[in-house]
Amino acid sequence: MDIAIQHPWFKRALGPFYPSRLFDQFFGEGLFEYDLLPFLSSTISPYYRQPVFRSVLDSGISEVRSDRDKFVIFLDVKHFSPEDLTVKVLEDFVEIHGKHNERQDDHGYISREFHRRYRLPSNVDQSALSCSLSADGMLTFSGPKVPSGVDAGHSERAIPVSREEKPSSAPSS
């Protein structure tokens, strides 16, 4: 059986009008303009893939900052309410878990769940940890650092998530 292999510089006559990037979509995050106009990318090359950097930054990547005075985690959880989130400190780790049951949105029914685990620096004061959810869905987990030589206190406990009415001051990537 002979299989015809098409050179990348030659395209089908209607090739630009067929969506060929089905697996580039971030399911549950909606569509961008270039998802609706697939012929723009295939006119360059049939092997061209849209950059996903913008989509990845908007899809829940966290940012961890650890400076001299404090430790902060920023996490985009815009699809979750404070009741859907659980934040626990287990020895040297903070575990953030989010889950919401199936609900209807513009495209059908969807359920989401994530689990993130971060190592806390040894000099973070675990008795002063706080967690808040901004109006735009940015979860901020923070704790002050203590001078070296002072016991930071390690224990297992749940951190309540408080709701803020203002948007986050986290950097937009």
Swiss-Prot record:
GO molecular function: metal ion binding; structural constituent of eye lens; unfolded protein binding
Entry-linked InterPro entries: A-crystallin/Hsp20_dom, Alpha-crystallin/HSP_16, Alpha-crystallin/sHSP_animal, Alpha-crystallin_N, HSP20-like_chaperone
Location of Deamidated glutamine modifications: 6, 50
Glycosylation sites: 162
Residues reported in the UniProt entry to bind Zn(2+) 2: 107
Membrane-spanning parts: none
Superkingdom of the source species: Eukaryota
Binding residues annotated for Zn(2+) 3, in chain numbering: 154
Compartment(s): Cytoplasm; Nucleus
Family: Belongs to the small heat shock protein (HSP20) family.
Protein's recorded name: Alpha-crystallin A chain
